[in-house]
Amino acid sequence: MNAPALEARGLKRNFGALIATDDVSFVIAPGARQALIGPNGAGKTTLINLLTGVIKPTTGQVFLQGRDVTFLSSSARVRMGLSRTFQINQLFPDLTPAESLGLAISERNGSGADFWRVAGGRPAIVAEIEELLTRFGLEAELDQPTRKLAYGKQRLLEIALALATRPRVLLLDEPAAGVPEEERQDILAALAALPADVAILLIEHDMDLVFNFASRISVLVAGRLLTEGAPEEIAADERVRAVYLGEDAHG
């Protein structure tokens, strides 16, 4: 039996008297398409920071592909196959998309310090850059400084950068946040085209995006998991409708 791609066991995180994450346990299977939703203040960001090693739990454990990574650093988890995007872009504004991807790939290969010399001299790196640019529809912008890209394109670049680490698990923190309505279909198309063997956890407020993407949804309220299930189960759950979706959401 294969180990889960990512597992939380009894995660709890206190900030003084505030319990931000309260005994959260869940499993993400290899290749899963899962979403985490919840109202503002539910503790989603704290949970993601616990999973990625930004902060450590008060109690509980995190397992990545069967290995206990609870007290490993974020960078160690990236090397082991856990990557993420951020609600607010973490990009290099003066680099082009091609340069940014080349740097990410070189870092993954352990040659980041020699990026400018190595990237252009290795056909495999150049080919991978081109493949990622094409996958995310960034070919036309490959030589533009990132700061000049449309915001939707910047969000796509951040997903491409996360994928450049070759993760086994990818956490996407509100990839559609701030993206104009007319560009959101590009985000959904990019998510749908992500490699099938990479487990995805999508944290998102856009319910159309969530229900079109995820095959399983976890609902977090006040730091605790309220429920988990298939999209149709979540949409029909009166508790979820009361605290998050609203009475008219999704039928």
Give the residues covered by each predicted segment:
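Glycine-rich phosphate-binding loops of nucleotide-dependent enzymes
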Residues: 2-251
